[in-house]
């Protein structure tokens, strides 16, 4: 693979990817794109894009270069393609669209007002959609702010700053010291041949996978099960409702969730850790919150090793400590964290709803633009630019004439080749 030459523009690069491939081939001029060229990705992430790079690129075959004729404004064409793509995605109702064919794209019916009105529409869309994108960017920053807010709440919780808990009210208790005083209260999933894919069943006792343990929330529904016989055989790896689950592997490891109280007993898989908390020492929810704090996450990373994927050393994990106050003070801490997290969740829900409305707003504005609603006053103010030789009808006749000329040239070339 070349490390220099002409960069090859792929869909990943259109979407911000910085991993480039290169070519030393000398290709026909139409296989290259320059800054400002209109492009269309017809696979994966559908839609129109601008070539925004200062140097010449070879565009990948999953990308088309769109060259509007003299009868169509290029910026107007970009927005028309954006509108059509949005309508196609909406009509798919969530079904993945594998690709768009070139012949299919050429059959699209497009809106084509007079050229002057095209430019007016493009200018209005530039202004309106820039405002939409600015609003969207501000909304998209809020979840990151909320993530930092939650971490600051957890940091305050385990330091006593969130409630009236003094620093000397905390005791550093090891993870194994927090476990119930019974066999198998702290452990990892089964190794290798102890649980094979061939042991999986369509029904029975559920398995818990790493993918279900994420950021304080347990994932939806088990997809794999084991038989009652296998379940008994793996009793050391059972997880009970209310147990704390920790990812043993990941990038980084250490995600935490509580196994829901309304779930049946299950079996954790290889890269999970389970902890049954001794309720005389700590509240399960307090332990979960303390383990989600940045301080504890860094401790977990410090005892992890691996190249492709980091894995937690269980022996060292047992010896990690959590700052643990009295049960009474834990109750107050959990109450305050619940309260603040609920507040953050409410804001996040509102933001997600607002983002959905903003995303719909783009398509709504485009639809209005191509129904002529954004330029109604412009047409009244500029009748000379949309009538006579500037009318849409005259534009259509010009396009038909250009097509006839193109057909004649094509036939002439074919005749020469046949010789």
Label each PLM-derived region with a short phrase:
Residues 26-27, 94, 194-195, 233, ...:
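Short, solvent-exposed loop/turn positions at domain surfaces
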Residues 10, 24, 29-82, 209-210, ...:
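A short beta-sheet element
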Residues 107-122, 152, 165-191, 319, ...:
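Non-catalytic DNA-recognition/assembly elements of restriction-modification systems
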Residues 120, 127-168, 349-380:
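Short amphipathic coiled-coil heptad-repeat segments
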Residues 81-110, 206, 290-322:
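Specificity-determining recognition surfaces
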Residues 336-350:
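Amphipathic alpha-helical coiled-coil segments
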Residues 375, 379-409:
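Amphipathic heptad-repeat alpha-helical coiled-coil/stalk segments that mediate oligomerization
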Residues 1, 5-35, 177-197, 211-241:
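Sequence-specific dsDNA recognition surfaces
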